[in-house]
Design a protein with these regions (language model features):
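Residue-identity detector for threonine
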Residues: 5-6, 62
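Bacterial N-terminal signal peptides
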Residues: 6-16
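Aromatic- and Gly/Pro-enriched helix-to-coil junctions and flexible linker segments
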Residues: 17-120
Length: 120
């Protein structure tokens, strides 16, 4: 390869990496509900917003049900964590109302997931 071809290949590689989707904190792939968020919801939310109970008509077990929302409308706005009531409630420590609160890492992971488009 000549110098120009090598430089062009490196530039394409750098631009391709820089334009990728937001990755999870481990840097491997974009955040997804099933892999990165469902466990957090299970630990802190499913008791009141799961199979047996759906407080405020809100089910947090799937991306579809989170987007459908409950009495207050959609729980998230994909790409906009600051406009998402789910993020607001956990960030401001309003939810869960009893028991252990999510840690800063879990809250940030939920924020990143919503910001990256709330993928399944």
């Amino acid at each position: 390869m000549n110098c120009f071809t090598t430089l062009a290949a490196l530039l394409a590689l750098v631009l391709g990496v820089g334009c990728g989707k937001q990755a999870s904190s481990d840097g491997e792939s974009p955040l997804g509900f099933a892999r990165d968020i469902k466990g957090i919801m299970s630990r802190y939310c499913f008791e009141c917003h799961g199979v047996e109970h759906k407080e405020a008509e809100l089910d947090l077990r799937t991306v579809e049900s989170i987007l459908a929302g409950g009495e207050s409308g959609a729980a998230i706005v994909p790409g906009k964590p600051d406009e998402s009531i789910l993020f607001e409630m956990i960030h401001d420590e309003q939810m869960p109302p009893e028991g252990k609160m999510p840690g800063a890492d879990d809250i940030e992971r939920v924020r990143q997931w919503i910001a990256s488009g709330a993928k399944p």
